[in-house]
Amino acid sequence: MSDKQFNIAIVGLGFGAEFIPIHQAHPNANLIAVCRRNEAEMNAVADQFNIEKRYTDYDELLKDPEIDAVHINSPIPDHAPQSLKALRAGKHVMCTVPMATTIEECEELCKAVDETGLKYMMAETVVYSREFLFIKELYDKGELGKLQYLAASHPQDMDGWPSYWEKMIPMHYATHVVSPCLGMVDGLAEYVSCFGSGTVRDDIAQKSGNKFAV
């Protein structure tokens, strides 16, 4: 492991706040800044974790020369625009899933990474879960034999889970099933096909504005 130190800023402090102790525990990371639109909520989190630099304006954060990389955990529609802004401002990017909501945004992000030479990570968390790592270890040791067929599903409607997912369309969570399948075999997708699987419940459709189970 390199001894190089990186100054990190976390953008979005809902789900994003869960990553603060992880960054603070990493020997190569200095978590020096946080960013959230709601100043009172931002200050509460920053006080809890003793973080000095605080921004309510993302553009102002990107002007900070001390920040090497941003970890984006903002609402999904902001992911691609904020990632592009960060890359063009000279910052490495770690962004929670999904990386974008259109193919065009994905292509633009790939182009920006090529042009800047900076690092971009779509931070899919499932491939770091203990369950996935356990199965991956079994597969790599040959204990699962040769894979003939692999399928995955990602349930959300479970007792005890937060209800934020009800406002999201299912496709926004596709990475949670695609990434572990690809990660298991260290592979890349060769082609993509899609079919619908009916409709979602009426109460969920009203919240998300989407009646389709895709």
Enumerate the predicted regions with their spans.
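N-terminal Rossmann-like dinucleotide-binding module
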Residues: M1-F49
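Nucleotide donor/acceptor-binding cores
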Residues: K4-F6, L118, Q148
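Short, Asp-centered acidic motifs that coordinate Mg2+ and/or phosphate
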Residues: A33, K53, D68-A69, Y149
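Conserved SAM-binding strand-loop segment of SAM-dependent methyltransferases
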Residues: I51-Y58
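Beta-strand-loop-alpha-helix segment that lines the small-molecule cofactor/substrate pocket
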Residues: A69-I76, A80-V127, G142
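Rossmann-like NAD(P)H-binding beta-loop-alpha module
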Residues: R130-M158, Y164
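Rossmann-like dinucleotide-binding domain that binds NAD(P)(H)
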Residues: D159-V214
